[in-house]
Swiss-Prot record:
One term of GO molecular function: ATP binding
Role of this protein: Part of the high-affinity ATP-driven potassium transport (or Kdp) system, which catalyzes the hydrolysis of ATP coupled with the electrogenic transport of potassium into the cytoplasm. This subunit acts as a catalytic chaperone that increases the ATP-binding affinity of the ATP-hydrolyzing subunit KdpB by the formation of a transient KdpB/KdpC/ATP ternary complex.
Name of this protein: Potassium-transporting ATPase KdpC subunit
Keyword annotations of the record: ATP-binding, Cell inner membrane, Cell membrane, Ion transport, Membrane, Nucleotide-binding, Potassium, Potassium transport, Transmembrane, Transmembrane helix, Transport
């Protein structure tokens, strides 16, 4: 019996050390050398060197002076990430969307873009379409007392055009660019 147990236990210990210690350390080391920014969470820093968020995770922005992210089913918490999985007929979803439409409705009476009313699959998508961002441009320009053309130029400068897929705008990067403008209100801090 001992002849059977000893090799089995030795294999368990050896494989635990390889897969639980050695492999993670090697992968972490390679990632830190080859892709240090991504390995550390794709953190975004302001001019003072303070972490303002991650380029890969959405966050909530409140106030008319900021571009708003997509809604999050998990309140932008990474632990509770994910979609609500409500059916279109679910009263809770209908109520939330109606509240969001009322909150977002602008003076131009243009329909609210769907991306500003629906959560992403993860609930943490940091990107919006240029159209959803442009829909908010008038509100942001008015709140910051900027010409609409200047805000639109900032949107164009922050629009990413991937090789595959539609153009997108990272909301955090755009808001940080807004904050770099000389006309940024004193109370408008990320």
């Amino acid at each position: 019996m001992s002849n059977v147990l000893r090799p089995a236990l030795s294999l368990i210990v050896l494989m635990s050390l390889i897969t639980g210690v050695a492999y993670p350390l090697v992968v972490t080391g390679v990632a830190q050398v080859a892709f240090p920014a991504q390995a550390n969470g794709s953190l975004v820093y302001d001019a003072a060197g303070k972490v303002r968020g991650s380029a890969l995770i959405a966050q909530s922005f409140t106030g008319d002076e900021w571009f708003q992210s997509r809604p999050s089913a998990g309140a932008f918490a990474t632990v509770a990430s994910g979609a609500s999985n409500f059916a279109p007929s679910n009263p809770a979803l209908v109520t939330r969307v109606k509240e969001d439409v009322a909150k977002l409705a602008n003076a131009s009476q243009e329909p609210v873009p769907l991306a500003l009313l629906t959560t992403s699959g993860s609930g943490l998508d940091p990107h919006l379409s240029p159209e959803a961002i442009a829909w908010q441009a008038g509100r942001v320009a008015a709140a910051r007392q900027l010409p609409l053309e200047k805000v639109q130029a900032l949107i164009d400068a922050n629009t990413q055009r991937p090789l595959i897929g539609p153009p997108v705008v990272n909301v955090l990067a755009l808001n940080m660019s807004l904050n770099q403008l000389p006309s940024a209100p004193r109370n408008a801090q990320l």
